Design a protein with these regions (language model features):
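A detector for short, charged/polar N-terminal pre-domain segments
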Residues: 1-14
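Short, charged recognition helix plus adjacent turn
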Residues: 3, 72-91
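Short basic helix-loop element that most often maps to the first helix and adjoining turn
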Residues: 17-33, 91
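Helix-turn-helix DNA-binding elements, focusing on the entry/boundary residues of the two helices
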Residues: 19, 30, 41, 55-58
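Short alpha-helical DNA-recognition segment
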Residues: 27-45
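Short, basic-rich loop-to-helix N-cap that marks the start of a DNA-contacting helix
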Residues: 50-63
């Protein structure tokens, strides 16, 4: 899938949709997840509808859903687009 034309909002909405599906698969209500993660119910509802949330609140939700490992894995493996990037990293 090529995301070159996606906006930040498009990506945020997709993340919200994925998190909502995981929450539902684990049979956790919005109110339960909000309480367990110390994120307000209103914030969680808004996130699931719009994708808008602070990074800290997003991380709290992922921690409660046992997804923090996936967050920690972001950007850990370098993706090079050309040889100059490889050379520059070695400097």
């Amino acid at each position: 899938m090529d995301y070159i034309w996606d906006t930040p909002s498009d990506i945020a909405v997709r993340l919200a949709d994925r998190l909502r599906k995981i929450r539902k698969r684990k049979k956790i209500t919005q109110k339960q997840l909000a309480g367990r993660s110390n994120v307000s119910y209103a914030t969680l509802r808004k996130f699931e509808k719009t994708g808008q949330i602070s990074l800290e609140s997003f991380i709290k939700l992922t921690m409660e859903l046992d997804l923090v490992g996936e967050i920690n894995d972001l950007f850990t493996t370098p993706v090079y687009t050309n040889i100059e990037e490889v050379i520059n990293e070695q400097r």
